[in-house]
């Protein structure tokens, strides 16, 4: 068995984008619960959730344009975009800039996520009913 070393971290959470920002907000006790904006919650018992806040660089919200083109974003569910963002942050945090193909092939990123792609799962289930 080989040893693994964690050399960099990246975070995209409802509290924000980036390890330092999320950590600062955690220490301050900031809540990320807001009114649901991604869908109409009127059929549910609550209208609040902790969504990833989209925005631009000026408001400390997640700017998807920094991580993926709009053309590519149309092809994937948001959770893929979130993983790309966090993985890119982790590689940059590690200061990892490999020059050789061999080093690129030996690079790995571990991603943790609850569940993703629910919109696509729901859409596909309607097609096959």
What does each model-identified segment do?
Residues 1-127:
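Conserved "HGTGT" condensation-loop signature of ketosynthase/thiolase-family condensing enzymes
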């Amino acid at each position: 068995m080989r040893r693994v070393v964690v050399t960099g971290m990246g975070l995209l959470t409802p509290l924000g984008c980036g390890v330092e920002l999320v950590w600062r907000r955690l220490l301050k006790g900031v809540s990320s619960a807001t009114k649901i904006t991604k869908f109409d919650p009127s059929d549910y018992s609550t209208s609040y959730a902790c969504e990833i806040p989209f925005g631009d660089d000026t408001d400390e919200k997640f700017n998807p344009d920094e991580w993926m083109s709009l053309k590519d974003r149309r092809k994937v569910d948001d959770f893929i975009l979130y993983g790309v963002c966090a993985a890119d942050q982790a590689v940059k945090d590690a200061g990892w800039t490999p020059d050789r193909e061999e080093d690129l092939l030996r690079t790995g990123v571990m991603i943790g996520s609850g569940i993703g792609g629910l919109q696509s799962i729901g859409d596909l289930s309607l097609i096959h009913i």
